[in-house]
From Swiss-Prot:
UniProt-listed Enzyme Commission number(s): 1.17.7.4
Family to which this protein belongs: Belongs to the IspH family.
Keyword Mitochondrion listed: no
Protein name in UniProt: 4-hydroxy-3-methylbut-2-enyl diphosphate reductase
Residues reported to bind [4Fe-4S] cluster: 12, 97, 198
Cofactor note text: Binds 1 [4Fe-4S] cluster per subunit.
């Protein structure tokens, strides 16, 4: 069996920044550090940060007075932000991915201008909740759609005063179909100046598509609640190849590999490389040969952490 590695795969700039913010806060201010929601959707990362002194909570009311609080990479609503600022907290850091913040600004701009806004995204995802929560104009409207069917069933106040934006971690193909439906249903709707689906999501979907062309099966390293990891597995399955979303090498079932001559491996944007290396080692134990990395798009984007945290600290092992 041959192992093929997708390129790029794994951590993106937004995830790197979010994890660094938590690590550096622990290093500089000591444990515990409170984080609203999982800082990124990866079990290994969350468990590693818990071991170092991070406490993950869902409600601001769970944070004791005088504590340090960090918002996750997925972003928060204006209501959550206001609640946190009203508390007696020592420090408040925002680990929201800058590309999510870009979408937040688009929604806030629409709200100020009185335009109705339509968000393409998955209901219940924290990024969607945070993005929807940027709209506050009572005379306008904020709507969520997930599919072309949702678009055709949508009722708005003024079809001539609409804009749309998207969750950053969606399937490029699925989103294109929804945008086509929006443009057909509402010819005067205005989209973002630049695509809201982030570079890392797009690059990883392109890379796994190339990987699936050559692989018999594909293993996607990522947690079940990771939106972008799920989209990678779905893309492969739509190409007619088996794909399995795994948290770690321990999840690999030997029968998956029966008859496979080429095993593809990729990782979602919130999955650390150590997990990929463990998967490679496990596959070699099961008889696979050396791994070969495919060519792909180079990524050199870096997002700075807040200036208060710009010191060198140890990284997660």
């Amino acid at each position: 069996m041959q192992i093929l590695l997708a390129n790029p795969r794994g951590f993106c700039a937004g995830v790197d920044r979010a994890i660094s913010i938590v690590e550096r806060a622990i290093e500089m201010y000591g444990a515990p550090i409170y984080v609203r929601h999982e800082v990124v959707h990866n079990r290994y990362v969350v468990e590693s940060l818990c071991e170092r002194g991070a406490i993950f909570i869902e409600e601001i009311s769970e944070v004791p007075d005088g504590s340090i609080l960090i918002f996750s990479a997925h972003g928060v609503s204006q209501a959550v932000r206001a609640e946190a600022r009203s508390r007696n907290l020592t420090m408040l850091f925002d680990a929201t991915c800058p590309l999510v913040t870009k979408v937040h600004m688009e929604v806030a701009r629409a709200s100020r201008k009185g335009k109705e806004a339509i968000l393409i995204g998955h209901a219940g995802h924290p990024e969607v909740e945070g993005t929807m929560g940027q709209y506050s104009n009572p005379n306008g409207g904020m709507y969520l759609v997930e599919s072309p069917d949702d678009v055709w069933q949508l009722s708005v106040k003024d079809e001539n005063n609409l804009c749309f934006m998207t969750q950053t971690t969606l399937s490029v193909d699925d989103t294109s179909a929804v945008i086509d439906a929006l443009n057909t249903r509402f010819p005067k709707i205005v989209g973002p100046r630049k695509d809201d689906i982030c570079y890392a999501t797009t690059n990883r979907q392109e890379a796994v598509r190339n990987l699936a062309n050559d692989a018999d099966i594909v293993l996607v390293v990522g947690s079940k609640n990771s939106s972008n990891s799920n989209r990678l597995a779905e893309l492969v399955q739509r190409m007619g190849k088996p794909a399995y979303l795994i948290d770690s090498a321990a999840d690999i079932q030997e029968f998956w590999l029966q008859g496979a001559k080429c095993i593809g491996v990729t990782a979602g944007a919130s999955a650390p490389d150590i997990l990929v290396q463990q998967v490679i080692a496990r596959l070699k134990d099961l008889g696979a040969g050396e791994s070969i990395e495919l060519s792909g798009r180079e990524e050199n984007i870096v997002f700075e952490v807040p200036k208060e945290l710009r010191v060198e600290v140890k990284q997660i092992d």
